[in-house]
Every structure is written in structure tokens, then in C-alpha cells.
Amino acid sequence: MKTLWRWLGRALLAAFALLLLWQVWLFAQVAWWRTHNPDSTSFMRLRLDALQEKKPDARLRHTWVPYEQISIHLKRAVVAAEDDGFVDHEGFDWDGIQRALEKNERKGRPVSGGSTISQQLAKNLFLSPSRSYFRKAQEAVITVMIEQLWSKRRILEVYLNVVEWGNGIFGAEAAARRYYGLPASRLGPAEAARLAVMLPNPRKYERSFGPRLAAHADRIRGRMAWAEVPP
């Protein structure tokens, strides 16, 4: 019996050591990306694998552009649509989380996550789309790392360059060229609002952008003037 407990203790210690090493690696990666642009993300690689299962030579559409080459209208539209308290919170919008929980309870199923831009970025960079308590806890840890090490400008820059905007389409530049034939720097308020409202389900909305979504884009456009973004 003592041998069993000894082996169990060693197994737990080894698991803890591996978890700690994983956190150290994550921290080092976040620190590196403070000044270096990520070539891809965990989610981008998952999507590429899925596309290549059907078409082996499939490629993602993705072109990195610096923050100053992204339209101010798109920055404001995304913040207005996804995280209107972005510049003020430290990674978590507790009021938004509470509203999401209440909405999910009314619907009887998860329909709203209440995730901030920082949380979405943490998930996209490192994690899978699966839902579990461990994944949410890890997302929270990475969110804290990002918020502590990066400026809000850097967070929004990376987010706008790696977020999904359609099937195989990632980042503002690829989205602007795919849907409007423009560089991201030249997007106007209307185009920006329409791109912003696609973010919750981009692969669905690129195929079906109906009147309901168009009305939502109009509402976002009306809120853009008050959306605060990093300079």
C-alpha cells in the first residue's frame, strides 16, 4: 500500500512539474510575441488541417499588417461589437460575463460567452475551441499574461491580424481584400461594421449575411464614434 501511495505521489508531482513547465513556456511565448509577430496561431493551424483534409493544397489567406495600417473604423467597429470596455478592463469584463450567464440561463443553453478581446486572443493563440473547465482556466491564465506583458495597442494589433473572418480567411488585411477588394487601411465605417459583426461566426456569416445581421451592423456603426481604441 505504501508503494502505491509513493507512486501516486510521484505521478502527481510529475504532472505538476509538467504543468508548471507548460506555463513557463506559455509565458516565454507571450513575452516573445510582445515584439515579434506570430506566424500562425493554434486555431489557424487547426483550420488549415481541416481544410487540407478536403483539399491537400489548401492555404490560409493571411497577411500581417502593422497597427497603423488598419483602418481606425475597423478598430472602433471591432471594439464596439466585441468588447466596448477594452481599454479600461484588465482582461476580464465581469459585467459582461454576468450578462452572458443570465442570457445563457434564459435560453437554457450556451449562446453567449462574454469573452473580451484579450480572452479571445488567448484562446486563438494557444488553445483549441473545445469547452472544458481546464481550458477556461488556462485561457484565464494566458489572458493575465497577455494583459501584464502587452500594451492594449499590441493586443488589438495582434487580435486584428489573427482573428478568423471566413473559411480560411484570417486577419484584417485578408478580410478587407476578400470582401471589398481593399487594403485594411482603406476600410470605411460601413465596411468595418459589417466585418465586425461577422466575428462571432465568420464561416456562417460569409455565406449568409441577411437583414438581421445588416441591422446589427447598422447598430454597431452608430456606436463606433464612442468606441475608445488605443492610439
UniProtKB/Swiss-Prot annotation:
The keyword Cell membrane applies. Pathway: Cell wall biogenesis; peptidoglycan biosynthesis. It catalyses: [GlcNAc-(1->4)-Mur2Ac(oyl-L-Ala-gamma-D-Glu-L-Lys-D-Ala-D-Ala)](n)-di-trans,octa-cis-undecaprenyl diphosphate + beta-D-GlcNAc-(1->4)-Mur2Ac(oyl-L-Ala-gamma-D-Glu-L-Lys-D-Ala-D-Ala)-di-trans,octa-cis-undecaprenyl diphosphate = [GlcNAc-(1->4)-Mur2Ac(oyl-L-Ala-gamma-D-Glu-L-Lys-D-Ala-D-Ala)](n+1)-di-trans,octa-cis-undecaprenyl diphosphate + di-trans,octa-cis-undecaprenyl diphosphate + H(+). One of its GO terms (biological process) is cell wall organization. SUPFAM superfamilies: Lysozyme-like. It is a single-pass membrane protein. GO terms for cellular component: peptidoglycan-based cell wall; plasma membrane. Its main location: membrane. It is found in: Cell inner membrane. One of its GO terms (molecular function) is peptidoglycan glycosyltransferase activity. The chain crosses the membrane at residues 12-32. It is an enzyme of class 2 (transferase). Its EC number is 2.4.99.28. InterPro entries: Glyco_trans_51, Lysozyme-like_dom_sf, PBP_transglycosylase, Pep_trsgly. Keywords: Cell inner membrane, Cell membrane, Cell shape, Cell wall biogenesis/degradation, Glycosyltransferase, Membrane, Peptidoglycan synthesis, Transferase, Transmembrane, Transmembrane helix. Belongs to the glycosyltransferase 51 family. Peptidoglycan polymerase that catalyzes glycan chain elongation from lipid-linked precursors. This is Biosynthetic peptidoglycan transglycosylase. The gene is mtgA.
